[in-house]
Each structure stands twice: as structure tokens, then as C-alpha cells.
């Protein structure tokens, strides 16, 4: 028995050790057990427990998704593009603590928090945290100091910032690659902080896409191979590169650099990429290190002259060359023919001329992309172009002066690889060649803005890869070919302004990727097909100015991306379907991002001009060519033309933005569902047969900018809820059957009477006052708004009677005091009732809201100057003779201004604000106290203010010579003539005042309404900027642009305001530029017969191509012809201020610096000025970004 037990024990022991041995071999090593625990603990903190399904504690971690092992150790983890949704602390505690980890890649993994307070092992060499939501100071990266072996660090595309004053440095001397691009880093000492401890082994440094300024000194980084400092605020000079013999990639684009850069890069002999685009370099191209260069971009600067022959030294290695956006002229140099490796050549937006240099181009055997757009090439397309197009991927000849037919054999080569063909904005005639279908790889075909005739070839239906078909503004006729149904990749179909007939082809229902359909201004008929509702990507549908008929299909409400619907001027009937709006709050419009457009806002000056405006695709077309539309469109092409690139940012929460159904035969009611569109900014239902009342829900359209319900059969009252439409700049309710009082709150008091006419029962400002006996409902309206002048008069009469009874018991002094009081009360009563001698200014007579005569008379002025502190409202009444019309010296968007002579004989100006109902006393007084403290010799000081009931009066220092507008444009009336010396003083003074508001006030003040009528002149003709802070006050201190400002000052408003409705200091700079142009030209910003269809800005640009000095005021040239050079110098300043790209405009401090340079004698030649004017930035429609922003909660 004992023997058996021993045997059993031995067998059991042997079995146990054998099993243990086998189990150990099949399972992770002991070192991996700890790592399993760390990895699983990381998974456990993920919100989505199903995200890493194969990460399990009973598995070998080396088999986990994204995990790599070596020698039974986890050495690499790659979870890029997985939505981890965790804080960085979870990463540092679980993953970075893995002892054997060498690489951790977490790009685009939804990681947030600060990079601080952690340690990592010395084995970590690569860490990629790019494209996340990391925040906090970039200085927290010093926590990585424990990662002594770290060579690769990428934290780009986060929101890291720079704290300003810091000590020490990054202390990562082992780094070879450092990428801080696309964060929120700003300041002048960033590069110094990064490199404060030397460069170590650094080979790759990228800090692009921030707001860094100061110096870039990398002279100690002798190993540096890659340097990208693009898209920052560097302006002080060229980077200090030192010995850059190892540098291969240098990108300094998108800054404000100028000067001689060739010396700084002279030792960079191994450069393969050099990008200095979008800076401020001028003159001829300087010598460059060309030996190894593969890509060279000098685009978007101000280089001049012909292309120098020394660039041929790069032909042995050069594959890409971009010289676009400069001022080069002459012919394309023949030496390009020897650049056999060149694949991309961009010479757009220069002044090259002549015929296409085919001999040179055909020698460039490797050419794939050829962009010669926006030049002055002319003639017919040569037959030899067929041989070139066979090897090209992109051919862009848009916006030149080509003529004749489009070559029928352009695509005859069976090996043709052409993908993009841009021939728009030329003078091509004849028919569209059906043989274009032989270019079977075509993705984009753009033939708009020519003189092409005939039909659209049905053969285009065989282009199975075509995404964009743009043929607008030609003379095409016939029907839209049914064969387009086979182009299932089609996204953009733009055929406006032709002579097309027939119906929308049913085959287009197969093109489910369509996002922009624009068929306006043709002769199309039939109904809107219901299948359009199945186009889930459709964002823009334009069918205006055709002969479509039938009902508007409710299926349009199935379009999940529709933001722009223009159906005006057709024959539609029936009702507006409520189902159209069921996608509101769910729309995502990302499908049209990056599309170039112009929007022409109709001015309503011609009866034939229908609709709110016209949205046009505008890629590759010169802005001045818009005049060609006048032959096909009855509307004026005025200064109200806005453009840019669409960049929608809806996150599935958007709504329609533009809805125009005007000039049809629609009937029925306005559906209440129309109020569900928070992003709608234009609504036009005018000129239909719509009846019923305006639904209260219209008041929910808080982003609404333009509302037209005119010429319908609407009845009832204007909903009081519409007072909440604070963004409203235009309204037209005329020609209806509306009745009752016009709402007194919101924007209604800013609109002229014409917008409410021909509504028999409508009353109240700006129409005649309502008769209380007309309706019981109005009596209730009266009571809810306090006592009216009639009841006020009764109170005054009772007070006078009581005084008469008591007078016998009073002494003489008391009697005299009562006499004075009765006189003042009578004056107030007479004025408030509108029975005084106020001329025809009815608006003032009906507009006062006072709470008790005695209280009003005794209210003191809240003064910022001691001599005024005892003034009362009664004193102001007396000083203006009851605000008599004779005392009126000006009117503006914020109210009327009166001259008041005080008892001591001094004069002040009193501004009576338009009603700002809804703003509390606290906000008003706080704003006044802020404005009253602002003192500067070039600002009109606020002396005091007075609140009487709902009325607000502001008291200013009186300016003897009134406004610049009056003095400049009506010198006889003003009694003074402005010579150049005075105008220059006014220009500098107003700039100095505006600069003080922008840069010396905390927080800075945006004027929002800078114009010549807001530049006042004192007794010394010194400029004083007025009305600063008024737009902010009138919009209840919101950061949105004052609506009344937009409506009241055409010609001064920068283009970007009409897209984002947000103001900025750079918007003030634009407006100042217009004022400076007024001083130089002597012309008003709009409505001059010299301008034609332009405004002042466009007119000056036109003259830049002729004789620029012709724009100057002839009176100045008579004064001294030698002034021309100085006037040109000041014109250059105006040009800089008027750049359509807001980010390129100078600040007002920089404007002052420009004036200082001019005074110091640093001249600017006339050719330089002309070139600046011809630069794209001066156009009235160039490069204005349109952002369809998600509005924060509570702002709508």
C-alpha cells in the first residue's frame, strides 16, 4: 500500500510539472501578465466597452488589435482613428507606463485633457498624439522629459496654447522630429522656447498653422532637414538659417515676410522643396539654390518682370513649379522645354500674353498639370494642343482671351488621361464637341461664360466618372439630355443662363450624388419631379426664372441636405407644403464645402428684377465679367455682390438658409412649420396669392436677415413675436390686407414707410399713428404700452388747474417759479403731442415715451464733465427750443442730432436715440459709463446722457464744421474747402482715433459704422471719430453687427459682414479704406454717375488698368500737379485696407505706421501702386469666406 502511494505521488508530481510546463509554453510569459493587466485596465475606462473586442484577459496581448510585440514584450500600440473618447491621464497611467513600449500612435483618437504629470520609460521613441483635443499650455510637454529616448513627437492639430512668459525650455534634446502644427500657439518667443536648450539631434521641425510671431532662429540646428513655419504671423524677417547645408524642405508660406530672402538660403544647397508663397516679397525673382530643387512655389507674392533664365538651372530636378498670383509678364520662356521632369506648372493670375507657347509645352513630356488661367493669352486653340492634352491630367485655360471653337479632336487620342478641363470665361464660340466624351477619365468639365451654342451633346452621358458639369451663361438650347442618367457620379449640374427648354429629365433620378442643381434663367417647363426628394446630398436647388408649373412637391422635405431653395419667377400654384420643413434641425451640408460662389443681391430698383438674389457658381471667372450678366438678367449688377468659398459646418443640426418662392401663384396659408428653420437668413414669399395671417412662428426665425411677404392677401396683425427678429435688415410687408399697430420693438422702427404701404388697417410708426377709437384691440395695445400723449395732456391740464387754485396762497417767488414750471410743462406737452412747430418730421412727433411730466422735467443729466452736472431734461428742452426742427443738424442710423445752446452760451450736440426697447437700464447705463470714460483728441467725447422714460439722450461736444461727408461733398453749404494738406490731416486723425479704439481700449472697441458722416471736424478741422460704441449699444451689446448699420451705409460695409454677420476690427479697417478713397477722389462711395454699375471701390480698380491718376479729385491736381506721387502713396494705404481677404488687411496701428513712412519720405512708385490695385485683394467679390456656422445655443 505504501509502495502504491509513493508511486501515485510520483506520477501525480510528474504530471503536475509536465502540465505546468506545457501551460507556461502556451501562455504569455510572466512579463506579459503585468502588461495584460495594464492594457485591460485601459480598455475598462473606455466609454464604449465594445470598441476593442479582442482585448481580453484570457488572450495573449500580442494578438490584440493594434498591439505589436517583440521578445514577449509589447513594443508598439497603434489605435489611430479609433474613437477612444478618454482623457490623456488614462493614456499616461495605462499605456505610457508599459516598460517595453517603444511606439504609441493615437492620432485622431478623440483624446482630451492636458499633457502633464506623467512619466514614461526610456524605451519610448515615438509618440503620436496628433488630431485630438489636447489643450493647455504647450509648456506641459516638458513632462515628457522622463522619456529620455523620445525621438519622434507629433502633437499637431490640437488646441495647445502658449502662456507667454516662460522660463526654461522644452528639454527634449533627443528629439529628431517635433510637430506642433495646427494648434493655438501664439506669441513671439515660441521658437526660442522650443530651442532654448539647443537643437540636439533635431532634423524635423513643424510649427505651421499657429499664430506665432517674432524671430525664427534655427542657426544652431545644423542637422535640420525639414522646417515648416508656414501660416503664422511672422513678419520681422527671413528665418535665421545659418549653415543650412542639410536642409531639404523649407516652407515659410502664408506669413507676412518681406525683404531679401536669397541671402538667407544661399547655403541651403540641398533644398528639394522651397515654398515662400503668400508673403510680401516684391521685385524680380532673386538667385535661388537650384541644384537639388524639386518643387518651387513663389505664388501669391508681388514678384515682377519676366521669368529669369537662371531658373533653367533647376530643370534637371524640378517636378513642380508654382509662380501664380504675381505680376509676371511677357511670354512663357523657351527654357521650360528642357524641364523634362516637370509634372506641374502653375502660371495663373499673372500678365502673360500672346498665343499658347506650344513648341515649349510639347517638349515637357512629363507634364501632368498645366494651369495658365487668369492671364491674357489669346487666339484660337492650336491643333497641336491635342498632343499635349493626351498626357495631361489637368488643363486650365480659364479667364483668358481665347476665341474660336473648342477643338473637336481635343480628346481624339485613345490614351487620353485628361481628368479636368477648364475653359470657362473666354470667348469660345460654336458647338460643344460631342467628341469630348472620348476623354473618358473626365471628372470636371467647365465651359461656362463663353458664347457656345447648339445643344448639350448626349454623348456626355458616357463620361462615367464625371462629377462636375458646368455650362452656364452660354447660348445653349434644346433639352437637357436624358443620357446624363448614366453619369451616376455627377455631383454638380450648373446650366443657368442659357436657352434650354423641356422638362427636367427623369433620368437624373439615377444621379443620387447630386449636391448642386442650378437651372435658373432658362425656358424650362413641367413640374418639379418628386424624385428630387430622394437626392439626400442635394444642398442647392435653383430653378428660378423659368416656366415650371404645378404644385411644389412635399417630397422636397425629404432632402436631408437642402439649404438653398430658389423657385422664384415661375408658374407654381397650390399651397406651401408644411412637410417641406421636416428636415429642419437635422441638416448637414458638408457636400458643398469649398465651392466658389458669388451672390448678387437684388437691389429692387427695377420692377423686372425678381427674387431676393442670385447665387452663382464662380470658379475660374473674373469678377469684372459679371457685367456680362446684364444682357441676360434685368437686375442691376451693383456693389452688392458678395463671394467666397462655401464652408458649411453644420453637424446634422442645420436648416434651410435661403428660401425664395416669390413671383408665383401660390395660395393658402403660410405654414407655421416655417418657423422651425433657425439658420434661415432670407425668406421671400412676395408676389403670390397667399392669404391668412402671418404665423407667430415667423418670430422664431432669429437668424432672419431679409423678409419679403409683399403683394399677397395676408390679413390680421403683424405678430408681436416678430419683434424678436433682431437680425432683420430688410422687410417688405406692403400690398397686403394687414391691420393693427406695427410692433414698436425690435427692428421695425428702422424701416421706411414704403415697406408697410397699401395695408388699409395698418398704423403706427413709421405710418401715421393709430386711432384708439378704431378697434378695441388697439385700446388694449395702448394700455400695455403706457400712457400716450393724449392722457399725458390730461395730466398736464389737471396739474395746471391745481396750480391755479393754489396760486393765491403763495408768495411772489413761488408764483414766479410756478410760471416757469407751467411754461416748461406746456413746451413738453406740446412737443410730446406732436402739435409743436416740428415741420414735417412726423417720426419725432409721435415717438416720445415719457413717464410723467414733472419727473421728466426734473431728471438730471448724468454728466462726465463738471459744468454739465446740474443740467436737467427741461434744460435740454429749452436749449433746443423743444427739439425744434431748426435745431436739427443731422440724422443717422442711431437717431437724430440737435444743436443745443446752453444758458452759458456754450453749444453741445444732443443725440436722441431711436427706441431700443428691451434693453434694461443697467445695461444702458453700464455701456454709457464705459463710453463716457473714453477720451482721445481724435474722438468726439460723450459729455453725458439722460434717460427719460423710454427715451435716451446723449450729449456730445459740439463740432463746429460738422461731418466730413458734408464738408467734402458739399463745400458750398459747409463754407469751407478742403485742400490736400487738410485732407491728409483728416485721414491721419481719423486713423489715429480708430487705432485708439482698437488697440488702447480694454476690451477693444469695434466701431461697426465707420464712414465719412461719422468723422466730425472741430474748429481746427481736426478729425474726431463719432458714434463709436453706438452699434454695440443698439444691439444690446451683442457681438453681431448692428443691423441698422448694415442697412444704412452701403458702400462702407466689408463683404464678410454679409456672410457671417459678425463684425471685427478688420471690418472697421475696410470702412476706413473707403473713407480714405473719398478723401483722395472727392467722390461718395456709391451712386456716382461715373461709376456705372460699380461703386467707388470697383471704379478705382477699373481705372487702375487705364490711368490711375484719373481717380484723384481734380481739385487736388489743380492745386499742385506734383502731389500725384504723394496721392499714389496714400492710395496704396487705401488699397491695403480694402483687401477683400480680411486677414490680409493691416491693423490701424499698421496704417499709422504707413502714414509715418510716407511722411518720412519712403516713396512708393506709381507702378507699384497700380499693381497693388490689380491684385486680387482689391476686388469687391474676391476671396470672401462664407461660413455657415453652427450658432451657439441661446444666440438665436
Swiss-Prot record:
Highest taxon listed in the record's lineage: Eukaryota
Resulting phenotype, residue 911 to E: Loss of kinase activity; dwarf mutant
Effect of residue 662 to F: In bri1-9; brassinosteroid-insensitive semi-dwarf mutant
Domain Protein kinase: 883-1158
Effect of residue 1045 to A: Abolishes peptide phosphorylation, and autophosphorylation
Molecular function GO terms recorded: ATP binding; identical protein binding; protein heterodimerization activity; protein homodimerization activity; protein kinase activity; protein serine kinase activity; protein serine/threonine kinase activity; steroid binding
Phosphoserine found at: 838, 858, 887, 891, 981, 1035, 1042, 1044, 1060, 1166, 1168, 1172, 1179, 1187
Residues marked Interacts with SERK1 (site): 705, 765
Effect of residue 1044 to A: Abolishes peptide phosphorylation, and autophosphorylation
Subcellular location field: Cell membrane; Endosome membrane
Protein name, UniProt field: Protein BRASSINOSTEROID INSENSITIVE 1
Task of the protein: Receptor with a dual specificity kinase activity acting on both serine/threonine- and tyrosine-containing substrates. Regulates, in response to brassinosteroid binding, a signaling cascade involved in plant development, including expression of light- and stress-regulated genes, promotion of cell elongation, normal leaf and chloroplast senescence, and flowering. Binds brassinolide (BL), and less effectively castasterone (CS), but not 2,3,22,23-O-tetramethylbrassinolide or ecdysone. May be involved in a feedback regulation of brassinosteroid biosynthesis.
Annotated tissue distribution: Expressed ubiquitously.
Mutagenesis or variant effect for residue 831 to D/E: No effect on kinase activity, flowering time or leaf size, but altered leaf shape
PTM description: Autophosphorylated on Tyr-831, Tyr-956 and maybe Tyr-1072. Phosphorylated on at least 12 sites, with a preference for Ser residues. Transphosphorylated on Ser-887 by SERK1 and on Ser-838, Thr-846, Ser-858 and Ser-1166 by BAK1. Phosphorylation on Ser-1166 enhances the kinase activity. Glycosylated.
Gene3D superfamilies noted in UniProt: 3.30.1490.310, Phosphorylase Kinase, domain 1, Ribonuclease Inhibitor, Transferase(Phosphotransferase) domain 1
Extent of motif Cys pair 2: 763-770
Cell membrane in keyword set: yes
PANTHER family associated with the record: LEUCINE-RICH REPEAT RECEPTOR-LIKE PROTEIN KINASE FAMILY PROTEIN-RELATED, OS11G0197000 PROTEIN
Binding site for ATP: 889-897, 911, 957-959, 963-966, 1009-1014, 1027
Amino acid at each position: 500500500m505504501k509502495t502504491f502511494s509513493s508511486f501515485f505521488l510520483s506520477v501525480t508530481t510528474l504530471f503536475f510539472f509536465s502540465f505546468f510546463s506545457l501551460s507556461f509554453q502556451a501562455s504569455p510569459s510572466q512579463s506579459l501578465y503585468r502588461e495584460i493587466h495594464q492594457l485591460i485596465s485601459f480598455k475598462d475606462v473606455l466609454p464604449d466597452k465594445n470598441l476593442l473586442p479582442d482585448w481580453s484577459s484570457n488572450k495573449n496581448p500580442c494578438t490584440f488589435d493594434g498591439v505589436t510585440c517583440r521578445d514577449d514584450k509589447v513594443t508598439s500600440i497603434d489605435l489611430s482613428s479609433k474613437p477612444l473618447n478618454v482623457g490623456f491621464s488614462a493614456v499616461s497611467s495605462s499605456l505610457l507606463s508599459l516598460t517595453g513600449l517603444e511606439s504609441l500612435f493615437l492620432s485622431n483618437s478623440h483624446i482630451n485633457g492636458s499633457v502633464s504629470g506623467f512619466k514614461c520609460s526610456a524605451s519610448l521613441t515615438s509618440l503620436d498624439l496628433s488630431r485630438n483635443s489636447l489643450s493647455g499650455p504647450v509648456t506641459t510637454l516638458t513632462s515628457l522629459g522622463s522619456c529620455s529616448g523620445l525621438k519622434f513627437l507629433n502633437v499637431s492639430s490640437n488646441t495647445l496654447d502658449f502662456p507667454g512668459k516662460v522660463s526654461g525650455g522644452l528639454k527634449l534634446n533627443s528629439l529628431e522630429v517635433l510637430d506642433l502644427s495646427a494648434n493655438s500657439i501664439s506669441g513671439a518667443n515660441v521658437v526660442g522656447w522650443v530651442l532654448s536648450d539647443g537643437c540636439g539631434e533635431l532634423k524635423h521641425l513643424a510649427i505651421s498653422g499657429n499664430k506665432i510671431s517674432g524671430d525664427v532662429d534655427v542657426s544652431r540646428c545644423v542637422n535640420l532637414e525639414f522646417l515648416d513655419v508656414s501660416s503664422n504671423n511672422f513678419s520681422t524677417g527671413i528665418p535665421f538659417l545659418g549653415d543650412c547645408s542639410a536642409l531639404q524642405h523649407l516652407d515659410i508660406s502664408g506669413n507676412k515676410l518681406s525683404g531679401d530672402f536669397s541671402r538667407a538660403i544661399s547655403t541651403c544647397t540641398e533644398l528639394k522643396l522651397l515654398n515662400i508663397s503668400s508673403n510680401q516679397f516684391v521685385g524680380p525673382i532673386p538667385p535661388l539654390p537650384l541644384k537639388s530643387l524639386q518643387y518651387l512655389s513663389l505664388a501669391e507674392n508681388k514678384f515682377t518682370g519676366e521669368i529669369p533664365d537662371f531658373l533653367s538651372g533647376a530643370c534637371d530636378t524640378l517636378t513642380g513649379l508654382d509662380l501664380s498670383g504675381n505680376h509676371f509678364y511677357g511670354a512663357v520662356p523657351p527654357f521650360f522645354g528642357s524641364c523634362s521632369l516637370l509634372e506641374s506648372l502653375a502660371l495663373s493670375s499673372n500678365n502673360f500674353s500672346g498665343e499658347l507657347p506650344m513648341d515649349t509645352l510639347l517638349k515637357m513630356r512629363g507634364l501632368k498639370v498645366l494651369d495658365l488661367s487668369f492671364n491674357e493669352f489669346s487666339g484660337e486653340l492650336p491643333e497641336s494642343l491635342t498632343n499635349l492634352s493626351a498626357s495631361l491630367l489637368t488643363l486650365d485655360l480659364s479667364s483668358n482671351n481665347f476665341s474660336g471653337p473648342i477643338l473637336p479632336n481635343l480628346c481624339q487620342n485613345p490614351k487620353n488621361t485628361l481628368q479636368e478641363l477648364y475653359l470657362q470665361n473666354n470667348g469660345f464660340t460654336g458647338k460643344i464637341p460631342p467628341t469630348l466624351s472620348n476623354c473618358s477619365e473626365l471628372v470636371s468639365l467647365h465651359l461656362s461664360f463663353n458664347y457656345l451654342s447648339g445643344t448639350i451633346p448626349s454623348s456626355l452621358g458616357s463620361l462615367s466618372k464625371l462629377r462636375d458639369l458646368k455650362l452656364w451663361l452660354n447660348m445653349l438650347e434644346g433639352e437637357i439630355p436624358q443620357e446624363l442618367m448614366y453619369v451616376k457620379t455627377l455631383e454638380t449640374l450648373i446650366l443657368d443662363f442659357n436657352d434650354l427648354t423641356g422638362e427636367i429629365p427623369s433620368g437624373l433620378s439615377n444621379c443620387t450624388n447630386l449636391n448642386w442643381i442650378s437651372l435658373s434663367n432658362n425656358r424650362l417647363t413641367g413640374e418639379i419631379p418628386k424624385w428630387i426628394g430622394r437626392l439626400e446630398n442635394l444642398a442647392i436647388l435653383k430653378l428660378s426664372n423659368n416656366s415650371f408649373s404645378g404644385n411644389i412637391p412635399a417630397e422636397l422635405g425629404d432632402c436631408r441636405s437642402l439649404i438653398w431653395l430658389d423657385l422664384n419667377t415661375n408658374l407654381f400654384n397650390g399651397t406651401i407644403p408644411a412637410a417641406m420643413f421636416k428636415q429642419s434641425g437635422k441638416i448637414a451640408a458638408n457636400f458643398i464645402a469649398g465651392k466658389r460662389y458669388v451672390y448678387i443681391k437684388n437691389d429692387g430698383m427695377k420692377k423686372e428684377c425678381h427674387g431676393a438674389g442670385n447665387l452663382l457658381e464662380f470658379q475660374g471667372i473674373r469678377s469684372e465679367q459679371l457685367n456680362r450678366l446684364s444682357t441676360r438678367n434685368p437686375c442691376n449688377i451693383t456693389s452688392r455682390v458678395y463671394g467666397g468659398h462655401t464652408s458649411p459646418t453644420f453637424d446634422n443640426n442645420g436648416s434651410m438658409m435661403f428660401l425664395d418662392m416669390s413671383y408665383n401663384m401660390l395660395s393658402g396659408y403660410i405654414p407655421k412649420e416655417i418657423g422651425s428653420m433657425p439658420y434661415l437668413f432670407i425668406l421671400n414669399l412676395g408676389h403670390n396669392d397667399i392669404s391668412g395671417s402671418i404665423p407667430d412662428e415667423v418670430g422664431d426665425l432669429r437668424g432672419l436677415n431679409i423678409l419679403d411677404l409683399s403683394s399677397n392677401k395676408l390679413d390680421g396683425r403683424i405678430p408681436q413675436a416678430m419683434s424678436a427678429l433682431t437680425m432683420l435688415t430688410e422687410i417688405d410687408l406692403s400690398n397686403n390686407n394687414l391691420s393693427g399697430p406695427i410692433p414698436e420693438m425690435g427692428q421695425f422702427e428702422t424701416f421706411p414707410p414704403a415697406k408697410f404701404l397699401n395695408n388699409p388697417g395698418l398704423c403706427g410708426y413709421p405710418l401715421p399713428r393709430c386711432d384708439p377709437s378704431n378697434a378695441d384691440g388697439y385700446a388694449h395695445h395702448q394700455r400695455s404700452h403706457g400712457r400716450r400723449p393724449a392722457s399725458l395732456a390730461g395730466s398736464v391740464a389737471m396739474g395746471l388747474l391745481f396750480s391755479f387754485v393754489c396760486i393765491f396762497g403763495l408768495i411772489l417767488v413761488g408764483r414766479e417759479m410756478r410760471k416757469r414750471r407751467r411754461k416748461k410743462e406746456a413746451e413738453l406737452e406740446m412737443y410730446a403731442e406732436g402739435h409743436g412747430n416740428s415741420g414735417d418730421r412726423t417720426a419725432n412727433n409721435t415717438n416720445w415715451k415719457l413717464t410723467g411730466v414733472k419727473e421728466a422735467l426734473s431728471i438730471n443729466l448724468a454728466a462726465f464733465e463738471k459744468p454739465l452736472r446740474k443740467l436737467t431734461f427741461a434744460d435740454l428742452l429749452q436749449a433746443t427750443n423743444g427739439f425744434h426742427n431748426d435745431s436739427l443738424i443731422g440724422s443717422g442710423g442711431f437717431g437724430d442730432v440737435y444743436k443745443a445752446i446752453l444758458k452759458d452760451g456754450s453749444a453741445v450736440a444732443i443725440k436722441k436715440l431711436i427706441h431700443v426697447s428691451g434693453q434694461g437700464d443697467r445695461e444702458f447705463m453700464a455701456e454709457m459709463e464705459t463710453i463716457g470714460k473714453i477720451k482721445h483728441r481724435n474722438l468726439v467725447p460723450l459729455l453725458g446722457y439722460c434717460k427719460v422714460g423710454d427715451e435716451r439722450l446723449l450729449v456730445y461736444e459740439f463740432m463746429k464744421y460738422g461731418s466730413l461727408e458734408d464738408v467734402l461733398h458739399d463745400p458750398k453749404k459747409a463754407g469751407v474747402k478742403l485742400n490736400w494738406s487738410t485732407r491728409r490731416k483728416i485721414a491721419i486723425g481719423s486713423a489715429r482715433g480708430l487705432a485708439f479704439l482698437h488697440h488702447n481700449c480694454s476690451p477693444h472697441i469695434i466701431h461697426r459704422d465707420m464712414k465719412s458722416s461719422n468723422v466730425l471736424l472741430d474748429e481746427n478741422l481736426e478729425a474726431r471719430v463719432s458714434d463709436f460704441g453706438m452699434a454695440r449699444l443698439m444691439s444690446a451689446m451683442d457681438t453681431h453687427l448692428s443691423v441698422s448699420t448694415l442697412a444704412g451705409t452701403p458702400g462702407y460695409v466689408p463683404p464678410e459682414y454679409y456672410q457671417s454677420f459678425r463684425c471685427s476690427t478688420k471690418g472697421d479697417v475696410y470702412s476706413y479704406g473707403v473713407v480714405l478713397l473719398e478723401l483722395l477722389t472727392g467722390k461718395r462711395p456709391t451712386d456716382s454717375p461715373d461709376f456705372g454699375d460699380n461703386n467707388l471701390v470697383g471704379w478705382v480698380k477699373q481705372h487702375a488698368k487705364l490711368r490711375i491718376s484719373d481717380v484723384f479729385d481734380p481739385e487736388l491736381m489743380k492745386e499742385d500737379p506734383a502731389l500725384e506721387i504723394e496721392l499714389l502713396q496714400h492710395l496704396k494705404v487705401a488699397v491695403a485696407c480694402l483687401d477683400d481677404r480680411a486677414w490680409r488687411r493691416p491693423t490701424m496701428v499698421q496704417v499709422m505706421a504707413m502714414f509715418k513712412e510716407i511722411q518720412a519720405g519712403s516713396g512708393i512708385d506709381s507702378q507699384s501702386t497700380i499693381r497693388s490695385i490689380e491684385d486680387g485683394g482689391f476686388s469687391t467679390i474676391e476671396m470672401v469666406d462664407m461660413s455657415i456656422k453652427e450658432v451657439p445655443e441661446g444666440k438665436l
